Design a protein with these regions (language model features):
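Nucleotide-sugar-dependent glycosyltransferase catalytic domains
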Residues: 5-188
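Short beta-strand element of Class I
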Residues: 2
Length: 188
């Protein structure tokens, strides 16, 4: 059985694959206007903080799910931190799905950040670190903020780009499979 934990807007597409759909909408917190604006502007800091808060909101629910369902593997999107965090917490093998490019120290060298993005990262890290500390009493094992976003060479990862297009693809271990983009022809 494949269980897919996601949000209601994806329910029909998930069910169409034959997977069981589990709604996570009830765990979305109320956002302040400032937080919502931060997310709309794709602030990495705000996105990470909200994902950590969703993890805490889902904690009791997912603890029970792991006890009763007992998954063999967690397949989580690279920016779905609650998926990663719960795989680590419950000692379940993790496979990371990366829809664009995989990022490690080598690959991140090609990225050009705007001054605004750099400021968000520099000033955001202390905020993220503060939020991460809130996870420890609940049994979550996380080293630091970078361990959430950066790819490591030990975690099995599916990357939806071609190895030829992946920057510094040679720096990734055999735990990575580059499957190319998912392109579908439009049905008329």
């Amino acid at each position: 059985t494949v269980r897919f934990y996601s949000f209601d807007e994806f329910e029909n597409k998930i069910k169409a694959t034959g997977a069981d759909f589990v709604s996570c909408n009830a765990f979305l917190g109320e956002l302040t206007e400032k937080e919502e604006t931060g997310l709309k502007n794709v602030s990495t800091t705000e996105m990470t903080i909200q994902d950590i808060r969703i993890t805490l909101s889902m904690d009791a629910f997912l603890d029970e799910e792991f006890k009763t369902f007992q998954p063999d593997v967690v397949y989580a999107d690279s920016v779905c931190f609650w998926g990663k965090l719960n795989a680590w917490k419950h000692n379940v093998p993790l496979v990371v799905s990366t829809s664009t490019f995989a990022f490690n120290q080598m690959a991140s060298q090609y990225m050009k950040n705007s001054p605004k993005e750099l400021a968000d990262m520099v000033f955001g890290l202390p905020k993220i670190s503060k939020e991460l500390k809130m996870l420890k009493p609940y049994g979550y094992k996380v080293k630091n903020a970078l361990s959430l976003v950066q790819s490591d060479n030990k975690t099995d990862s599916v990357v939806y780009t071609s190895e030829r297009f992946q920057p510094y693809s040679e720096s990734f271990s055999d735990h990575y499979v580059f499957v190319g983009p998912s392109v579908f022809s439009k049905i008329e």
